[in-house]
Amino acid sequence: MVLEMNTKENVLNHLKEYGFVVIPNYWSPEKCKQALNELKTLPNQVFEGGQGGDLRCQHSNKYLSSSNEFLNDSFIQNIADDYSLCNIADRVVAGIVNYNSDLQTDSGGGWHVDSELPAQLKSFMYLTDVNEENGPFMFVQKSRDLVNELQKHSNLRISQELVNEHVNSEDIIEMVAPAGTCILADSTYLHRGKQIESGTRYTYTTYFYEG
């Protein structure tokens, strides 16, 4: 579901109906390049390994002005305030997913939900172009009720077998989009980062929690 970013009401309505919204051209290509150059200055020691084998700087907003700007984005904050009680922008995680032919790597460690709260917003910024092969964000629309019926294992993960059995393929949205695309998603819905097959994916992700 792709929207123009200028209508808060439309964004909220689609978020509530489908669980996600894709906002194109939220940042310019130049702004993304600046953010990417900033991100690449971070020392290795500020990164940790994610569950899917990706690299994550948990509080990149403390180091990078572009990340801090994304954390304090007023439009996204207004959406968060109206969407759920999880409206405190806690941190921006700078994420890097690198292809390695010897490893199976993704962001998130397979299908999962972030919590079992009634609703919880997360915002993503693609800093580079994301295609079918370099680990796009994947999301199961309208899956909130379904999630409650599925067995979960370590850290609210849901097996691929259960997804294959219970999820209609047309409800799985693979978010291929250029740099500058902003994605708002309810992380209590089923989602994952696709396993990377080539290249590198760079993103910012803002995590929202209850106050």
Please place each PLM-identified region on the residue numbering.
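Histidine-centered catalytic micro-motifs
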Residues: 108-116, 190-193
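Active-site region of the double-stranded beta-helix
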Residues: 112-116, 127-136, 143-144
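Non-heme Fe(II)-dependent double-stranded beta-helix
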Residues: 1-17, 23-111
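Double-stranded beta-helix
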Residues: 133-190
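Short edge-strand/loop segments of extracellular domains
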Residues: 101, 140-147, 208-211
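A short hydrophobic beta-strand segment most commonly corresponding to one strand
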Residues: 125, 199-211
